[in-house]
Amino acid sequence: MKIHGICLVKNESDILRYFLRESARWCDRIYIYDNGSTDGTWELACEIARESPRVIPFKQEGKPFRDHLRGEVFRRYRDDAVEGDWWCRLDADEVYIDDPPAFLARVPRSCHVVWSAHLQYMLTEKDLPRFRPEDEVKAPEATVETLPRHYIANASEARFFRHRNRLRWDETSWPTHMGLVSPERIRVKHLQYRSPAQIARRLSTRHTAAQRGYLHFEHETQQSWREKIADSSGLHFDAGDGRYVVDPAQLPNHLEPRWVRAMKRVMHGCGFWA
């Protein structure tokens, strides 16, 4: 079993080195599609690729952001995958807590899709004293020592799907008939807010994407990085001891309705769908 990671990235140079180092521990191939970075992300990815054979720069192209752009990577490299492999939506601001190869190995054969339990890490008022004035202009490189420590587990998204030779991925966010969702979720740290300059750049990038027609950044309408600073009293603290608080009641439901799951079992089981 191999894992193929599709990394659609834009302006993540501060965390890219850390992210690729962590992801290369378990992801067999990391395909980088740069969506028009202006902060050196693409150049850094190419530099790292010369040192790490698992990192494969696909291309840099600044077309309007859409989730279906990941399908371009899938279509380009799908022949390198075999039945039993997995594909991962591999975002540059995410680091996995659970070991993906071990986790995926125990997913029931009847299931094809794995969703995440997203631990959303925030900058809080307790982080602000460590930042210098220049950190509002240029994002410092993210390291395990400087990453935010406060989080709440309240989000969930699809992250992995099984490769099948008949899968099709056209102009959609995910492949057609991607499959049945596994009940168990894999835990991932979502390190989306890391420093004042990085937050400001993130907001600007998403404002531009929204202006160019992307409809799913409604949670990123703030104008200042200071509006993203969270109150630590409402969050859990990551003490670095490997213990995390994940309350299933705070996560959105990720499973299909029963009738949909039953239909998927029949259609995939009989081979009508890939």
Which ranges hold each PLM region?
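Hydrophobic targeting segments
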Residues: 1-7, 23, 29-33, 188
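Short, well-formed alpha-helical segments that are part of the catalytic scaffolds
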Residues: 12-28
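Short, structured coil segments at secondary-structure junctions
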Residues: 26, 48-51
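A conserved acidic beta->alpha catalytic loop
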Residues: 34-47, 62-65, 91-92
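Conserved donor nucleotide-binding strand/loop of the catalytic core
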Residues: 50-68
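Catalytic-site signature of metal-activated, phosphate-bearing donor transferases
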Residues: 68-74, 97-274
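Active-site nucleotide-sugar/metal-binding loop of Leloir-type enzymes
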Residues: 71-86
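Short beta-strand-to-loop acidic/aromatic patch adjacent to the donor-nucleotide binding site
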Residues: 83-97
